Amino acid sequence: MKHELRINNYVLYDNRPFQIASISDEYPSLKTIEFGFGVVEWNDISPIPLTEELLVKCKGVKLAHYINCYNVNGIQLILRGGWFEYVHDIHIKSLHQFQNFYFFTKQQELTIEL
């Protein structure tokens, strides 16, 4: 996961979502409300599983004519066996992977209300 992350990606730390503030080989730092930036260990952060609830928080719209299919600003995702995949068979398992894919596709950050 370390090499998948970008600044502003969301991860779990202490079972709470935080955004990555900076990245180095030794450690990442997180943006926190309590004390600004916080340095943590790589082993202490984990990906946030991508769920239907999160897709709604990303302004996703469930497509009524498909089972488990969402549209997030023109990107169509289908829930298949515990992961989401884009219409071109790209497996997306976590929020940070979707953030990166969205940025690559749309050239802008994904809006999320966590």
Model feature map: region roles:
Residues 1-5, 108-114:
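Short intrinsically disordered terminal tails
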Residues 6, 13, 31, 56, ...:
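Compositionally biased amphipathic helical and low-complexity segments enriched in hydrophobic
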Residues 8-12, 52-58, 64-72:
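Short, solvent-exposed secondary-structure boundary motifs
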Residues 23, 27-43, 62-95:
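Acidic, low-complexity, intrinsically disordered interaction modules
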Residues 36-62, 95-105, 114:
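Intrinsically disordered, low-complexity, charged/polar segments
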